[in-house]
């Protein structure tokens, strides 16, 4: 079996560790722990790394299409490898959750998230496993765009790093147990 772990974000140094890139941050942490490096694949429009865990090939994916076109890379990879939707796990930021809170879901709407909207449009379903990481709402009249493309303040950054560790644990648990329902029960709280 093969699994695709896809972190959403925007490519380039300009967006490094911005709120919208928490999905990339988690995928980078998984790659570091597995001691694997990314290579860019022009056909899939993504940076890819892979490793084996319990005989299963795991792909770490960072789409390079920019957030709003993430579905292109996800669809291309699912199609090429002949994978089911159950083999997909998307990790991304959520404005409507407080900073650092995580929520695992097996289905749902885009909730205003353009990366998720693109994935739903390209794969044709809202039913796929996902992990949302809270980045909070904009404060003091800041626009949503400015908020998601800004970096975390010091306190929020510490909280995000802790939540990324928790998501890392949940992803590893999911890969070991091969059961997303059980993973949701354990990590949603």
UniProtKB/Swiss-Prot annotation:
Claim: Transport is one of the keywords in the record: no
Annotated site residue numbers, Discriminates between blocked and unblocked aminoacyl-tRNA: 10
PROSITE patterns: PEPT_TRNA_HYDROL_1, PEPT_TRNA_HYDROL_2
The entry's keywords: Cytoplasm, Hydrolase, RNA-binding, tRNA-binding
One annotated GO molecular function: tRNA binding
A GO biological-process term: rescue of stalled ribosome
GO cellular component, one term: cytoplasm
Subunit structure: Monomer.
Protein's recorded name: Peptidyl-tRNA hydrolase
């Amino acid at each position: 079996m093969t699994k695709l772990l896809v972190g959403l974000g925007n490519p380039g140094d300009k967006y490094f560790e911005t709120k919208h890139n928490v999905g990339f941050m988690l995928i980078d942490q998984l790659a570091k722990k597995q001691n694997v490096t990314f290579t860019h694949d022009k056909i899939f429009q993504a940076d890819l790394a892979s490793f084996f865990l319990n005989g299963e090939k795991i792909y770490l994916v960072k789409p390079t299409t920019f957030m709003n076109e993430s579905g292109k890379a996800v669809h291309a990879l699912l199609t090429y490898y002949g994978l089911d939707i159950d083999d997909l796990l998307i990790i991304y930021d959520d404005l409507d959750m407080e900073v650092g809170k995580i929520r695992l879901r097996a289905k749902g709407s885009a909730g205003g998230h353009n990366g998720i909207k693109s994935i739903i449009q390209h794969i044709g379903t809202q039913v796929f496993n996902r992990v949302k990481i809270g980045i909070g709402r904009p404060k003091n009249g800041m626009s949503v765009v400015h908020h998601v493309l800004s970096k975390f303040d010091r306190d929020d950054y510490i909280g995000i790093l802790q939540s990324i560790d928790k998501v890392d644990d949940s992803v590893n648990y999911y890969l070991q147990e091969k059961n997303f329902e059980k993973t949701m029960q354990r990590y949603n709280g």
